[in-house]
Amino acid sequence: SSLLNSLLNRRDLAKVSRTPGKTQAVNVFQISTSDPHLSQFYLIDLPGYGFANVPKTVRSQWGPLLESYLLGREALLRVVLLVDSRVVTDQDRQTMAWLHSIGHDPVVVVTKVDKLKAHERVRTMRQVHQSLGMAEGNAVIPYSSLTGEGRDRLWGSLREAAVRRDL
């Protein structure tokens, strides 16, 4: 949700909390821009799983929710997998493998990079790349909702997917 607010340059579009796990349902945002390839599209905020402080019963419902959502969307242009810069979890690896198994090659965005020291950044990006078994040419986008770092690269990735759709 923080990333969506940052990406769209809006403070309170998506609800954000200090405690991870605020997003507990599929939230749909209709976006309009002046870009001819991205004139109107939807951004979907799905529940995260990593550090969410929610009951196990709630967390157990997220897998089927994500699965049914992602499997039922033929018009889906781009999947963005957010990975916390502090650690790549087993769930991150499983999600990446599952996305590949259903035909999606997600853009991986490493969040909270503003918390990393300069010497940790390169190592963290390499670890994410290796931990998720990413192909050599696939980039990892470092992102900070606080500073806006990575915003232009992520917009570029979304636009690239829209341009390919239009060809």
Describe these PLM feature segments:
Residues 1-53, 163-165:
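Conserved G1/Walker A P-loop phosphate-binding module
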Residues 43-45, 80-81, 141-144:
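Extended hydrophobic secondary-structure segments that form protein cores and membrane-embedded regions
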Residues 57-59:
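Long, positively charged low-complexity segments
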Residues 29, 111, 154:
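Residue-level signal for inorganic ion chemistry
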Residues 115-167:
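Canonical P-loop GTPase G-domain recognition
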Residues 7-11, 70, 132, 158:
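Hydrophobic aliphatic residues
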Residues 22, 48-50, 85-88, 113-117, ...:
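Conserved nucleotide-binding/hydrolysis micro-motifs of P-loop NTPases
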Residues 38, 61-138:
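Conserved C-terminal guanine-recognition region of P-loop GTPase G domains, centered on the G4
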